């Protein structure tokens, strides 16, 4: 009788469902590239077009300091009916795909970078790894909230709710902070990994 070898229990994969090399570096690279391309399409496409329609104002999505009720009304009025329709589609349609892609690509990248042996001999504690992954998930969640608020603002126009604008503005500000923190963490871990990789190749 042939028996299948039993995989040792791992707290990183308690059900034993993940392949040993999941995620692969190739998968992480593909997802990061796809996320970057989608961001570039939105930034240089719809968001740039909305900025031109408004006479140079910055769309809600990329205002790091948020926006007041008066600023939100001024922007939506400046882009006109054409711009408000354009904001709903294609911009918000494209932006519906960005948050999940961002969370998955950055989450898997952080998981990959903290796999045993990548940034140190000792394994990174599981709680730390989950905490790292929580940052891009937070960013994506806030992006979804922001998008929902913008949909409500476009739908209610010209009647704007001050509460909706405040929630949207706060979501935008914290989203940008969480995004910057995610990129900083990922870049820092990548530098440590590359330095260790270089050192091993030099001294081995």
Indicate residue ranges for each PLM-predicted region:
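Interfacial loop at the N-terminal end of multi-pass membrane proteins
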Residues: 11-91
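A juxtamembrane structural motif centered on a specific transmembrane helix
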Residues: 185-199
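Membrane-interfacial loop-to-transmembrane-helix junctions in polytopic alpha-helical membrane proteins
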Residues: 17-27, 80-90, 121-131, 160-174
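Membrane-interface loop-to-helix entry segments
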Residues: 89-104, 170-181
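Hydrophobic alpha-helical transmembrane segments of integral membrane proteins
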Residues: 104-152
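Alpha-helical transmembrane segments
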Residues: 38, 100-108, 139, 181-188
């Amino acid at each position: 009788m042939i028996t299948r070898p039993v995989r040792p229990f791992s707290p990183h994969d308690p059900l034993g469902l993940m392949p040993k090399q999941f995620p692969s570096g190739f998968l992480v690279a593909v997802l990061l590239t796809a996320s970057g391309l989608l961001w570039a399409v939105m930034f240089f496409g719809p968001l740039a077009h909305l900025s031109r329609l408004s006479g140079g104002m910055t769309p809600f999505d990329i205002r790091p300091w948020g926006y007041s009720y008066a600023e939100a009304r001024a922007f939506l009025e400046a882009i006109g009916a054409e711009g408000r329709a354009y904001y709903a589609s294609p911009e918000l349609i494209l932006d519906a795909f960005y948050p999940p892609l961002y969370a998955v690509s950055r989450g898997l990248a952080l998981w990959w970078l903290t796999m045993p042996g990548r940034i140190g001999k000792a394994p990174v504690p599981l709680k730390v790894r989950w905490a790292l992954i929580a940052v891009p998930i937070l960013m994506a969640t806030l992006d979804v909230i922001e998008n929902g608020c913008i949909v409500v603002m476009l739908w209610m126009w010209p009647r704007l709710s001050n509460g909706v604008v405040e929630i949207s503005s706060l979501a935008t500000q914290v989203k940008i902070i969480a995004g910057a923190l995610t990129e900083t963490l990922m870049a820092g871990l990548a530098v440590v990994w590359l330095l260790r990789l270089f050192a091993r190749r030099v001294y081995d």
